[in-house]
Amino acid sequence: MKKLIYFFVSILMLSCANVEKEASEPAVVKNSESEAISFIIDLKVNPESAEDLDGFIQEITENVLKTEDFCIEYAYYVSEDRTSVTLYEKYIDSESGVKHGQNFMASSFFDRFFNLFTLTKFIVTGPASDDFKKFTSENGFVIEYRNSVDGFVR
């Protein structure tokens, strides 16, 4: 009986160790199986703009963080000479990308954004839906679409 108890305790401990190991390993998802879409937007800073670059970036970033829980990632990357910016955005799916666009265009940030920046390139990666493409086209955005051939996300 004593050996049987030791046996069951040993099995229990080993099974718990495996669960911890499995829980700590991140899941790997192939890019081609993900619904997420990303925006890579190249911008030139308009030198005649009176808008404060750092202040604007902080303000709009805080707004997206507070109001758009469907936004996975949102970041501005500024060149050393502060004349160019790359804006990287990632959304859970195309519908979320449309919702972000609607929110942005209806906000006070829209005019301020285009006063501060000139859009030079707009790339969307991932499975952009026809509805997303229609929405952006109807609103004057010229976009290069790129689909995943291979890759992964942990």
Task: Kindly give the residue locations of the regions a language model identified.
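Short S/T/G/P-rich N-terminal loop/turn motif that feeds into the first structured element of a domain
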Residues: 16-85, 92-102, 115-154
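Sec-dependent signal peptide recognition
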Residues: 2-7
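Conserved serine/cysteine hydrolase catalytic core
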Residues: 112
